[in-house]
């Protein structure tokens, strides 16, 4: 007998699982649309799906923020329905043999900073910035980065009074140790500066191939965190960024200069990398490394310059990684739909285009034919992790502190109404995400 979630989503095959529950393909029985269904046992030790769904609702409308379709309780499970997205940046990093060019890193940096800035503008910290929690879209949104996984997100200020949360110490580590800021390791309450410092480590991870504190051995998780913390604090920024453009060093110095309640100058950080991008002579054409790898002819169109800076570490899997195999299909096949859209848009058809376009509305830069869209036959939800074992704050009743409503259901938003309310063709109506923990990264 077919299982139907919320009276409208037919439960399909299982495509992933993790510490917070299980991930399934679902079909909207009314429209035939594929969705991703995240199921969490009601009796789980640390329930977070209800909280996460409410954060999704509060962030709706932002570029690169997934659109939640439905949340409710079905039998013994909390359930959330959202659209499928393309691969995560961690998946694409592996696809590109664990090394990104400077051009790809800079194109990503512009969008990643924008995503973090938007969350902060809505009063939330992400607190688990890592490659797994950024996904590419599909089809016309294939060059747009989405920020996902709000299970550890925290409200850092009151939206009415703008009062900032108080400075505190002796906090347990929340997030992923590999990308955690130095202050987070020191037990200091996180604020906006910490999300941005974590993002800096993500960028260096991409361009270097690995970080100096990967692969450390320890007897216990606590000892491993301590080793990572020690190595991170003993690695000067100048050493971490050695042989790479000075803008990366400047990025870290700025983030670490911020005080606890300071509002970061996001424009300054984006300008650092945009100026470097222009100085290197790159074209902001959304031809990423994975585009060229899948469709080599796209590289001859954009003629990206090679990364002039040598990598400090040879690319290769970290010794500390313990990843599950990709479910159901080969890695390259999994990305074919997303990469296809990148390649299609690189055929010049409207004359000469400007070289430098820094725009969050990435969809305006992509033209995908109906044939191409039909070729995207299989869309995989990408799994990411936000492990409860790494957080010392899961005992906090975040949901009750943050939201007064105790309602168990979020009514599905009519897509036409959403578009009218936002006053634009949002695109989030068609390209969304689902995340569930599947592999620990420390």
UniProtKB/Swiss-Prot annotation:
The Protein kinase domain sits at: 9-278
What kind of modification does the protein receive after translation?
Autophosphorylated.
Where's the active site on this chain?
128
**Which reaction is catalysed here?**
L-seryl-[protein] + ATP = O-phospho-L-seryl-[protein] + ADP + H(+); L-threonyl-[protein] + ATP = O-phospho-L-threonyl-[protein] + ADP + H(+)
Q: Which SMART domains match?
A: S_TKc
One cellular component term from this protein's GO annotations in UniProt: cytoplasm
Residues reported in the UniProt entry to bind ATP = 15-23, 38
Q: Give me the stretches of Pro residues compositional bias.
A: 305-317
**What's its top-level EC category?**
transferase
Superkingdom, according to UniProt? Eukaryota
Q: Where does it localize? A: Cytoplasm; Cell junction, Plasmodesma
Q: Which UniProt keywords apply?
A: ATP-binding, Cell junction, Cytoplasm, Kinase, Nucleotide-binding, Serine/threonine-protein kinase, Transferase
Q: Where is this region: Disordered?
A: 299-323, 381-421
Low complexity compositional bias: what residue ranges?
A: 384-394
Per UniProt, the ranges with Polar residues bias are: 400-417
Q: Which PANTHER family match?
A: CASEIN KINASE-RELATED
Say which family it is in: Belongs to the protein kinase superfamily. CK1 Ser/Thr protein kinase family. Casein kinase I subfamily.
Q: What does this protein do?
A: Casein kinases are operationally defined by their preferential utilization of acidic proteins such as caseins as substrates. It can phosphorylate a large number of proteins.
Q: What is this protein called?
A: Casein kinase 1-like protein 10
């Amino acid at each position: 007998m077919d299982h139907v979630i919320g009276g409208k989503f037919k439960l399909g095959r299982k495509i992933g699982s993790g510490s917070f529950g299980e991930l399934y393909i679902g079909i909207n029985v009314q429209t035939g649309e594929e969705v991703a269904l995240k199921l969490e046992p009601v009796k789980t030790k640390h329930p977070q799906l209800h909280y996460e769904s409410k954060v999704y609702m509060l962030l709706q409308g932002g570029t690169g923020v997934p659109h939640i379709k439905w949340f409710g309780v079905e039998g013994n499970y909390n359930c959330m329905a959202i659209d499928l997205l393309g691969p995560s940046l961690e998946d694409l990093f592996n696809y590109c043999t664990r090394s990104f060019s400077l051009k790809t890193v800079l194109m990503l940096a512009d969008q990643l900073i924008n995503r973090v800035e938007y969350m902060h503008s809505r009063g939330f910290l992400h607190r688990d910035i890592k490659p797994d929690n950024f996904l590419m879209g599909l089809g016309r949104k294939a060059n747009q980065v989405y920020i996902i996984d709000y299970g550890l997100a925290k409200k850092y200020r009151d939206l009415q009074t703008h009062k900032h949360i108080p400075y505190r110490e002796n906090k347990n580590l929340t997030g992923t140790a590999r990308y955690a800021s130095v202050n987070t390791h020191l037990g200091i309450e996180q604020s906006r500066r910490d999300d941005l410092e974590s993002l800096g480590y993500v960028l260096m991870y991409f361009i270097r191939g690995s970080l100096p504190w990967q692969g450390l051995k320890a007897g216990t998780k606590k000892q491993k965190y301590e080793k990572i913390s020690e190595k991170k604090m003993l690695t000067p920024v100048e050493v971490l960024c050695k042989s790479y453009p000075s803008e990366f060093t400047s990025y870290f110095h700025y983030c670490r200069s911020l005080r606890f309640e300071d509002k970061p100058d996001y424009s300054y950080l984006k300008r650092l990398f945009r100026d470097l991008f222009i100085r290197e002579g790159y074209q902001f054409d959304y031809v990423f490394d994975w585009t060229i790898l899948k469709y080599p002819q796209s590289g001859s169109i954009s003629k990206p310059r090679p990364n002039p800076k040598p990598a400090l570490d040879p690319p290769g899997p970290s010794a500390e990684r313990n990843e599950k195999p990709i479910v159901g299909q080969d890695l390259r096949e999994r990305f074919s739909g997303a990469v296809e859209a990148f390649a299609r848009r690189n055929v010049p058809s409207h004359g000469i285009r400007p070289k430098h376009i820094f725009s969050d509305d990435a969809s305006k830069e992509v033209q995908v034919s109906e044939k191409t869209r039909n070729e995207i036959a299989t869309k995989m939800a990408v799994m990411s992790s936000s492990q409860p074992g790494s957080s010392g704050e899961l005992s906090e009743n975040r949901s009750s502190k943050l939201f007064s409503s105790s309602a168990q259901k979020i009514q599905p938003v009519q897509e036409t109404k959403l578009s009218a309310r936002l006053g634009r063709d949002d695109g989030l109506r068609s390209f969304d995400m689902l995340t569930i923990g599947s592999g620990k990264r420390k």
